[in-house]
């Protein structure tokens, strides 16, 4: 029986069996002052547990409905225990003065960054679920990162109240909608990465921006043919994320096996780390800033906030691109073909900083490609979304969905777009639910269509030295529609998909964009 879940955002609800810990905005743990703790002899009032919102009902609506239903009977909480739903903790008390305002701004910014960092847990849970249920082919690497997952199951909380480790064995089952979306995302990107590595005889290199707990490097190294074609693989992410990833790599024999004997951790040779100790060397933060968490012959793990590469960043926080990606931190070669991966990254970055990053990464390498997976708030039903498949140019592909043109033609087509399209109804629901998790989408708002996201690469990479720029973009719905009947049937039967209309709407709001640039 089909559920009435129209306009449901995948982040809003989950399966009943895992709704308490997966896909929900991380709950903040209340810290009670020591003088307010109860004495062991005092009577303690026990309140009934809060009901779990039912599937298909946005959490904000579920919470408001439940609160209205119980407010008449339940006693009002003590003033010191009040929290404002959906607002940072700093807004629940009145503050005054410049110092308090500055503190509030800093706290809010930190909460927003923590929320973005925490999205890696969603992606990892989704891949684990798709692997467990047979959507994706089995591989042993992804599960090695699972113990770094946050959980809402009562585990200790870390900075800003976000739960810390999720232990193997916890429920990781996602809804069929999410599992199919994860399959389409992972299988499409995996196929494009493999195609890139197999092109020609040259070795290739890959830069994954916002890599999180991704296991792609290890999957490449497990393939004899692909591993010999890979020159170097670089992963960049927040320091908190790379620290967690380092811990898992050092504790996992399977993951450590792909690091050669000359590898180093924060500059310390891997061979110097005791095989009987799982301790991670401390990064002392010397005067010369060091970004390489792990440095191996074919792999570099870098701890950096890519937003700080922008020249408008305060000098104390600014990161030099040459210092980050130069020979001191990585084994990248600017003359080799390079693929840059942005998996659900650009949506969270202010458009001016993201465009600067795209442009300067493109200028750094002679032959560069980009593969971006992101949110399309306007969906693929908007007229400009279709234009990406049929933009006219001198060398337009005959197949709708692949636009190939020179730099000049790419720029001329981009000027025909009058203004950003507004989010669809479903896109607005997505924004509301993500904002409840302290997630802002400045990049997705600035580029709401697939066409706009495709053209941002053409604009960023167009200069007098460019020989050719090719761009294309497709929604996950388009990829789903083009699957063979046998494969779609297999995926639908795995869990008995009965939410046809909902999955179509969901897949229309996620896209994969490709761009390629070569110099003469």
Swiss-Prot record:
Identification of the protein by name = Leucine carboxyl methyltransferase 1
Functional summary from the UniProt entry: Methylates the carboxyl group of the C-terminal leucine residue of protein phosphatase 2A catalytic subunits to form alpha-leucine ester residues.
Tell me its EC number(s), please. 2.1.1.233
Tell me the segments the record calls region Disordered.
Answer: 1-116, 142-174
Taxonomically, the superkingdom here is Eukaryota
Comp. bias intervals (Polar residues): 95-110, 142-151
Q: Kindly give the Pfam families that the UniProt entry links to this protein.
A: LCM (PF04072)
The gene is: PPM1
Q: Which PANTHER family match?
A: LEUCINE CARBOXYL METHYLTRANSFERASE, LEUCINE CARBOXYL METHYLTRANSFERASE 1
What chemistry does it catalyse, as a reaction equation? [phosphatase 2A protein]-C-terminal L-leucine + S-adenosyl-L-methionine = [phosphatase 2A protein]-C-terminal L-leucine methyl ester + S-adenosyl-L-homocysteine
Instruction: Fetch the SUPFAM superfamilies from UniProt.
Output: S-adenosyl-L-methionine-dependent methyltransferases
A Gene Ontology biological process in which this protein takes part is:
methylation
Q: Where does S-adenosyl-L-methionine bind?
A: 185, 210, 237, 305-306, 343
Query: Which InterPro entries does the protein's record reference?
Result: LCMT1, Ppm1/Ppm2/Tcmp, SAM-dependent_MTases_sf
Task: Please verify whether the record's keywords include Cytoplasm.
Answer: no
């Amino acid at each position: 029986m089909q559920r009435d879940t129209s306009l449901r955002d995948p982040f809003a609800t989950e399966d009943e069996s895992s709704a308490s810990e997966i896909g929900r905005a991380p709950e903040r743990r209340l810290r009670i002052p020591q003088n307010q703790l109860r004495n062991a002899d005092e009577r303690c009032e026990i309140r009934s547990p809060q009901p779990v919102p039912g599937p298909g009902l946005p959490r904000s609506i579920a919470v408001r409905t439940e609160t209205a239903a119980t407010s008449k009977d339940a006693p009002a909480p003590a003033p010191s225990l009040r929290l404002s739903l959906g607002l940072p903790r700093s807004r629940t008390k009145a503050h005054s003065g410049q110092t308090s305002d500055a503190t509030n701004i800093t706290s809010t910014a930190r909460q927003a960054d923590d929320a973005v960092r925490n999205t890696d847990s969603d992606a990892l849970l989704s891949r684990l679920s798709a692997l467990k249920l047979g959507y994706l082919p089995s591989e042993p690497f992804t599960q090695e990162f699972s113990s770094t997952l946050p959980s809402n199951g009562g585990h200790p909380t870390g900075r800003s109240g976000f739960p810390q480790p999720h232990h193997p064995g916890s429920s990781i089952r996602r809804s069929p909608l999410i599992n199919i979306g994860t399959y389409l995302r992972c299988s499409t990107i995996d196929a494009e990465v493999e195609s890139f590595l197999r092109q020609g005889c040259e070795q290739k290199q890959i830069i994954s921006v916002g890599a999180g707990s991704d296991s792609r490097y290890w999957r490449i190294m497990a393939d004899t043919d692909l591993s010999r074609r890979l020159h170097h693989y670089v992963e960049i992410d927040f320091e908190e994320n790379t620290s967690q990833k380092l811990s898992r790599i050092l504790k996992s024999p399977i993951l450590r096996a792909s690091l050669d004997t000359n590898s180093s951790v924060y500059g310390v040779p891997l061979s110097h780390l005791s095989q009987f100790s799982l301790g991670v060397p401390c990064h002392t933060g010397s005067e010369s800033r060091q970004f390489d968490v792990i440095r191996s012959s074919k792999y570099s793990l870098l701890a950096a906030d890519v937003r700080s590469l922008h020249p408008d960043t305060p000098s104390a926080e600014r990161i030099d691109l040459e210092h980050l990606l130069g020979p001191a931190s990585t084994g990248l070669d600017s003359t080799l073909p390079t693929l840059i991966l942005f998996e659900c990254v650009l949506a969270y970055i202010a458009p001016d900083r993201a465009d600067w990053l795209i442009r300067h990464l493109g200028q750094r390498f002679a032959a560069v490609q980009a593969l971006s997976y992101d949110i399309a708030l306007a969906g693929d039903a908007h007229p400009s979304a279709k234009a990406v498949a049929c933009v006219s140019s001198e060398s337009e592909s005959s197949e709708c969905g692949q636009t190939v043109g020179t730099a000049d033609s790419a720029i001329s087509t981009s000027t025909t777009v009058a203004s950003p399209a507004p989010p669809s109804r479903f896109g607005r629901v997505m924004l509301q639910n993500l904002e409840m998790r302290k997630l802002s989408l400045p990049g997705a708002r600035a580029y709401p269509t697939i066409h706009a996201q495709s053209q941002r690469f053409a604009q960023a990479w167009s200069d007098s030295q460019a020989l050719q720029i090719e761009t294309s973009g497709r929604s996950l719905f388009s990829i789903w529609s083009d699957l063979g009947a046998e494969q779609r049937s297999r995926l639908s039967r795995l869990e008995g998909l009965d939410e046809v209309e909902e999955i179509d709407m969901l897949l229309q709001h996620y896209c994969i964009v490709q761009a390629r640039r070569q110099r003469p």
